[in-house]
């Protein structure tokens, strides 16, 4: 009788330990050889591409680009514009002049050169 009681206790403890083992199993990333990995692999690539910093090149498929045959997306520097208010103007007159800056550093605090995407078709450059 003692043997069956000990055996029952042992089996009960073993059953409890095994059931908690499966419920507490870590669910990490799937292994590369598994079927789950190939299904979620495409979604991971899409999510990673969305998280990249910066802009994407445009699709240069407009009417302008069809005439030359080969059209490609390129990055070109933009010309920043700064509006300066004349010190002689009063608050009632709001005249301002626009000055084009060719990548001058100004206060020597930055060397930022903004770039934008354009479509290049032969020797011509178009807005996308």
Swiss-Prot record:
Principal subcellular localisation of the protein: secreted
Source species, domain of life: Eukaryota
GO biological process: guard cell differentiation; stomatal complex development
InterPro entries in the cross-refs: EPFL
Disulfide feature: 60-119, 65-71, 68-121
Cellular localisation: Secreted
Region (Disordered): 79-100
Polar residues bias: start-end ranges: 79-90
Pfam family, one: EPF
GO cellular component: extracellular region
Signal peptide residue numbers: 1-28
Keyword terms: Developmental protein, Disulfide bond, Secreted, Signal
Main function: Controls stomatal patterning.
Family: Belongs to the plant cysteine rich small secretory peptide family. Epidermal patterning factor subfamily.
Official protein name in the record: EPIDERMAL PATTERNING FACTOR-like protein 2
């Amino acid at each position: 009788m003692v043997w069956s009681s000990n055996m029952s206790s042992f089996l009960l403890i073993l059953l409890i330990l095994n059931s908690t083992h499966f419920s507490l199993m870590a669910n990490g990333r799937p292994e590369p050889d598994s079927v789950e990995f190939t299904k979620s692999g495409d979604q991971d690539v899409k999510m990673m591409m969305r998280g990249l910093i910066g802009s994407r090149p445009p699709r240069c498929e407009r009417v302008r680009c069809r005439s030359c045959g080969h059209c490609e997306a390129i990055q070109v520097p933009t010309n920043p514009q700064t509006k300066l208010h004349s010190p002689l103007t009063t608050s009632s007159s709001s005249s301002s002049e626009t000055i084009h800056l060719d990548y001058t550093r100004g206060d020597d605090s930055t060397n930022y050169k903004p770039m934008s995407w354009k479509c290049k078709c032969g020797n011509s450059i178009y807005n996308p």
